[in-house]
């Protein structure tokens, strides 16, 4: 069991001792290929941060401490995190704040559309915290955002959704009426490590969510992502890729897990660029339409390019 550490500001949760830094377990040194060069001009980055803050909106880029934030913000792109900034789950790999969920901002869909227009975006990615407190898991709010954004023509919408634990049927019924252009749900890692990495989630149910969406919306691409470096084995990764292919997933992303803070899971291994290239080859050989592999690859990193190349 994960023991909650009382910290009202950061809402940090204690993780198992075997995965925390200690004298017996040294922290792996970050390799050179993971070093990021900050852009010289921070004007666009600060502009997006200011706009989001002013409208009380959130980006997963900021909330999850994404390493690609400087590049994405500098290119004028961001992944909107809807339904608040506090997650009802306690996944020990994730930097997003955990705790009691916030009240839904009913004006959020319109606020997002305003920003989309202001930033002249043509591709929008929506994601959310897990909302186990809601009867539909937050699916209706996703659909409202999709509906609002599509008031502006020629904008593609990708959604990266939680697993809607116990509310999958309700959520899928809603998405059938208001489908996105790409449906994304991250499998994250291998089933053997699920109880450690995704407590409260279920590997088979995540696969089934992807399968059921594809069943009701066969013409809409489905997508999923993995993060490596948490102790998984190569054969397990290949097995997960085969499972994803079997449920109709056509786009897959594979990146390196990076420890957000000392209070999160330790990195067990840094995967080399060569190894990522090998996984890309394996995934393509399994029949995926598009595969994006690399140390800094994230589910919504260059999502617009992923869609355009589909």
From Swiss-Prot:
<comment type="pathway">
    <text>Protein modification; protein lipoylation via endogenous pathway; protein N(6)-(lipoyl)lysine from octanoyl-[acyl-carrier-protein]: step 2/2.</text>
</comment>
<dbReference type="InterPro" id="IPR007197">
    <property type="entry name" value="rSAM"/>
</dbReference>
<dbReference type="Pfam" id="PF16881">
    <property type="entry name" value="LIAS_N"/>
</dbReference>
<dbReference type="InterPro" id="IPR013785">
    <property type="entry name" value="Aldolase_TIM"/>
</dbReference>
<keyword id="KW-0408">Iron</keyword>
<keyword id="KW-0963">Cytoplasm</keyword>
<feature type="binding site">
    <location>
        <position position="300"/>
    </location>
    <ligand>
        <name>[4Fe-4S] cluster 1</name>
    </ligand>
</feature>
<comment type="similarity">
    <text>Belongs to the radical SAM superfamily. Lipoyl synthase family.</text>
</comment>
<dbReference type="GO" id="GO:0005737">
    <property type="term" value="C:cytoplasm"/>
</dbReference>
<dbReference type="InterPro" id="IPR003698">
    <property type="entry name" value="Lipoyl_synth"/>
</dbReference>
<feature type="binding site">
    <location>
        <position position="91"/>
    </location>
    <ligand>
        <name>[4Fe-4S] cluster 2</name>
    </ligand>
</feature>
<dbReference type="Pfam" id="PF04055">
    <property type="entry name" value="Radical_SAM"/>
</dbReference>
<feature type="binding site">
    <location>
        <position position="66"/>
    </location>
    <ligand>
        <name>[4Fe-4S] cluster 1</name>
    </ligand>
</feature>
<keyword id="KW-0004">4Fe-4S</keyword>
<keyword id="KW-0479">Metal-binding</keyword>
<dbReference type="GO" id="GO:0016992">
    <property type="term" value="F:lipoate synthase activity"/>
</dbReference>
<dbReference type="GO" id="GO:0051539">
    <property type="term" value="F:4 iron, 4 sulfur cluster binding"/>
</dbReference>
<dbReference type="InterPro" id="IPR006638">
    <property type="entry name" value="Elp3/MiaA/NifB-like_rSAM"/>
</dbReference>
<feature type="binding site">
    <location>
        <position position="87"/>
    </location>
    <ligand>
        <name>[4Fe-4S] cluster 2</name>
    </ligand>
</feature>
<dbReference type="InterPro" id="IPR031691">
    <property type="entry name" value="LIAS_N"/>
</dbReference>
<feature type="binding site">
    <location>
        <position position="94"/>
    </location>
    <ligand>
        <name>[4Fe-4S] cluster 2</name>
    </ligand>
</feature>
<feature type="binding site">
    <location>
        <position position="72"/>
    </location>
    <ligand>
        <name>[4Fe-4S] cluster 1</name>
    </ligand>
</feature>
<keyword id="KW-0808">Transferase</keyword>
<feature type="domain" description="Radical SAM core">
    <location>
        <begin position="73"/>
        <end position="289"/>
    </location>
</feature>
<dbReference type="GO" id="GO:0046872">
    <property type="term" value="F:metal ion binding"/>
</dbReference>
<keyword id="KW-0949">S-adenosyl-L-methionine</keyword>
<feature type="binding site">
    <location>
        <position position="61"/>
    </location>
    <ligand>
        <name>[4Fe-4S] cluster 1</name>
    </ligand>
</feature>
<keyword id="KW-0411">Iron-sulfur</keyword>
<protein>
    <recommendedName>
        <fullName>Lipoyl synthase</fullName>
        <ecNumber>2.8.1.8</ecNumber>
    </recommendedName>
</protein>
